[in-house]
Amino acid sequence: MLKDLFVKRQYATVKSSTLKKSISEEKPNIPSGMWEKCDKCNSMIYAEDLENSKFVCATCGHHFRLNAKERIKVFFDKDTFKEFWKDLKTTNPLDFKGYEEKLKSTKTDSTEAVVTGVGKLNGIEVACAIMDSFFMMGSMGTVVGEKITRLIEHATENKLPLMIFTASGGARMQEGIFSLMQMAKISAALAKHSEAGLLYISILTDPTTGGVTASFAMEGDIILSEPNALIGFAGRRVIENTIKETLPDNFQKAEFLLEKGFVDAIVERKNMRACIYKILILHGVRN
């Protein structure tokens, strides 16, 4: 009897597999894509709320990057945008190894890093190019350059104002000199558009860098930017290693460029339509 008092009590045991199964069954079944995390403040945002706010965080004001399709939906009058030259396809002029595979692996609705066409803003017809950083980081190759050049020529012939939403990592290295040539080609077309007395508005979005910054992004009659957008040519580390100096924390941000006179205004996404409409009216553009 006394001996039984010192016998260790038997506790109930649960098999590991049973426990794991029980825990997994208790997890809520949340469909993927229902929530998005803000990169700046880490807030979790309901996807529908994010779309309704034009993909801007309600907590901190962070502007999410948009693909071309989202940008068109946010900016233009509903169902007014008509895309041009969608069937232009990239080739591999330098036989760069793995280039075709990289193009095929790019999972986006766009067929290239820019969408070009004509749309309406409060009834006013404008020619517009929307760069897509989700397609090979918005890099500029021959097709990107050709589509933008054709759009500028179309705007010149039809006396249309021009807008370009820039978002790019720069020239596409897989196309070498063919890619770099697009800078001069686009700039030449812009010069003719300007000589015709037509308006060109450049809207810089995050990120706008490299050869795009060195050419048409900074050639607008009016240059606007979304808040906190990364804008520059060479990377921060490259510059610091070259000049042997530490750069300011906000270097290559839209606010820094505004302070230095490289940007005319920083406009929040919710105000972009109204701002550009006002600019068009002030410049005598009508329906």
Curated annotation (Swiss-Prot):
What organism is recorded for this protein?
Clostridium beijerinckii (strain ATCC 51743 / NCIMB 8052)
Kindly provide the name given to this protein in its UniProt entry.
Acetyl-coenzyme A carboxylase carboxyl transferase subunit beta
Q: Write out the entry's keywords from A to Z.
A: ATP-binding, Cytoplasm, Fatty acid biosynthesis, Fatty acid metabolism, Lipid biosynthesis, Lipid metabolism, Metal-binding, Nucleotide-binding, Transferase, Zinc, Zinc-finger
Q: Which GO terms describe its biological process?
A: fatty acid biosynthetic process; malonyl-CoA biosynthetic process
What role does this protein play? Component of the acetyl coenzyme A carboxylase (ACC) complex. Biotin carboxylase (BC) catalyzes the carboxylation of biotin on its carrier protein (BCCP) and then the CO(2) group is transferred by the transcarboxylase to acetyl-CoA to form malonyl-CoA.
Superkingdom, according to UniProt?
Bacteria
Checking PROSITE patterns in the record gives: COA_CT_NTER (PS50980)
Complex and partners: Acetyl-CoA carboxylase is a heterohexamer composed of biotin carboxyl carrier protein (AccB), biotin carboxylase (AccC) and two subunits each of ACCase subunit alpha (AccA) and ACCase subunit beta (AccD).
Q: Name one GO cellular component term.
A: acetyl-CoA carboxylase complex
**Residues covered by the CoA carboxyltransferase N-terminal domain:** 34-287
In the record, what terms sit under GO molecular function? acetyl-CoA carboxylase activity; ATP binding; carboxyl- or carbamoyltransferase activity; zinc ion binding
Q: What is stated as this protein's family in its record?
A: Belongs to the AccD/PCCB family.
Q: Which sites bind Zn(2+)?
A: 38, 41, 57, 60
